[in-house]
Design a protein with these regions (language model features):
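Alpha-helix N-cap/N′ positions at the starts of helices
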Residues: 19, 65-69, 97
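Charged, alpha-helix-enriched surfaces in structured cytosolic catalytic cores
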Residues: 4-7, 31, 35, 68, ...
């Protein structure tokens, strides 16, 4: 431990872009006091954020769910279930997600997604978290998403297009 007062230490996981994303995860660990959790909730509220409290586990709640959903969407794309844009539309219209899992993966960075999945697989000793081979292929080719102009989608002048060489 690097502190004499672990009861006063809290983690807060913000989402990018921070000014636009309303959620913050407040990370509870074994030694934290309820007062510290309450102060973190208050701080989040004063920043205009909604907060959830999660235990200190790999991936917390949101990253763990997000990367698994993204990895499954990549699997579906590789299997030819639907095009990338149709998979994303299914989640936007069918589940009211503001952005589909494939577009979000491109925004976050496919390399980041892969690193998180590998970290979860190692932490939980569970190969179900391993990145799909298509994700590995894209990252190894340097197709990392929006930041490189190519990932699941082709990113032109701010517009995205389905790639012809992936899935359908």
């Amino acid at each position: 431990k690097s502190t004499q007062k672990p009861e006063r230490v809290v983690g807060m996981h913000f989402f990018n872009p921070v000014p636009l994303m309303p959620l913050v995860e407040i990370i509870r660990h074994d030694g934290i006091s309820e007062r510290t959790v309450d102060i973190a909730k208050y701080a989040a509220d004063k920043m205009g954020k909604s907060s959830i409290v999660v235990n200190d586990v790999p991936g917390f709640a949101t990253s763990r769910l997000g990367v698994v959903l993204g990895n499954e969407a990549i699997r579906m794309l590789a299997e030819g279930v639907a095009s990338a844009s149709d998979i994303d539309t299914a989640m936007k219209l069918g589940y009211r997600h503001p952005m589909g899992p494939l577009e979000l993966s491109d925004l976050v960075g496919l390399d980041v997604r892969r690193d998180i999945l590998n970290g979860l697989a190692e932490s939980f000793e569970d190969d179900s978290y391993r990145p799909h081979p298509l994700l590995n292929r894209l990252v190894d080719a340097g197709d990392l998403g929006r930041k490189t102009g190519r990932g699941i989608y082709e990113w032109g002048t701010g517009e995205k297009r389905d790639r012809d060489d992936l899935g359908m």
